[in-house]
C-alpha cells in the first residue's frame, strides 16, 4: 500500500536519519527539506517543498502551489497535518500516516529550522 494512500488504519514508518538537507531555490521558486537514511544508498527518504512566493496570477488554492510531500516515491500535496521537532526526533503526520525519524547524532543544517518554518508554518511545533 502506498504510504500516502487513504486507509482506515494509520500507517507508521520509523527510521534512523543519516542525512538532512535543505535548499532554497529562487530560480525554481521553492524551499525544500530532505531527510534520508543514507546519502547515496538510501532505502527511506522524505522530501517536503513549498513555493517561496506565488506569482500575482497564481492560484493559492491550487494543489501544486501548496505543500508537496514525497516519501519513498509516493507523492501528495497538502496532506501534511502536523510536524513536531525535538532534539532526538522529527515526527510527521501526513494524511493517515505517521513518520518518525530518529535524528540523534545527525548533522542538522543551520537553515533547517528556518526552512521548516517557511514550509510548514502553523503545522510546525518545536520542543527543546
Task: Give each language-model segment a name.
Residues 41-52, 92:
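Broad, structure-driven detector of short, well-ordered beta-strand segments within folded domains
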Residues 2-5, 19-25, 55-63, 90-94:
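An extracellular/secretory-lumen and virion-surface interaction module
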Residues 12-14, 19, 84, 89-93, ...:
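Ser/Thr- (and often Asn-) enriched beta-sheet segments in non-cytosolic proteins
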